[in-house]
Amino acid sequence: MSVTSITSTSAPRRIGAWVLQGIVATAFFAAGAAKLAGAAYMVQLFEQIGLGQWFRYVTGVIEVVGALALIAPGLVWFGGLWLGGTMFFAVLTHVFVLHTSPVPAIVLGLLNALIVYLRRDELAATIRTTTKIL
């Protein structure tokens, strides 16, 4: 299985993909760390959501794990899907629970979709390998 999915593309595209992954990973790591550290804004936000502070911790772990996956060769596609799914639920939460703008979550979700697209060969190789094992 190949750990670099865009090796057949140009160097600028590969570099751009890594830069994008780094930026998105940094954003999610910072957000997850703020949740885990109990930043006042995050505590208040999760009180408004109404599921309790345990959900803040779970969300923080999800974001940190996703951020780490975005910079781990071979797991980038997983991180993109993981965090893209997280942003889908964040959009729903912003619209239906918090009644606030979902735009930041939409943008982050689209950036994760772009990362998955750029790493689609890696994802396909993983699927092929998995189906051969099964």
PLM feature spans:
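Solvent-exposed, well-ordered loop and adjacent helix/strand elements within mature globular domains
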Residues: 26-55
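Solvent-exposed, flexible loop/coil residues
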Residues: 40, 55, 59, 127, ...
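Short juxtamembrane and helix-loop transition motifs at transmembrane-helix boundaries
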Residues: 21, 36-47, 62-73
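Extended, low-polarity transmembrane helix blocks
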Residues: 1-33, 74-134
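Core segments of alpha-helical transmembrane spans in multipass integral membrane proteins
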Residues: 30, 51-71, 85
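Alpha-helix C-capping/helix-to-loop hinge sites
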Residues: 49, 68, 91-95
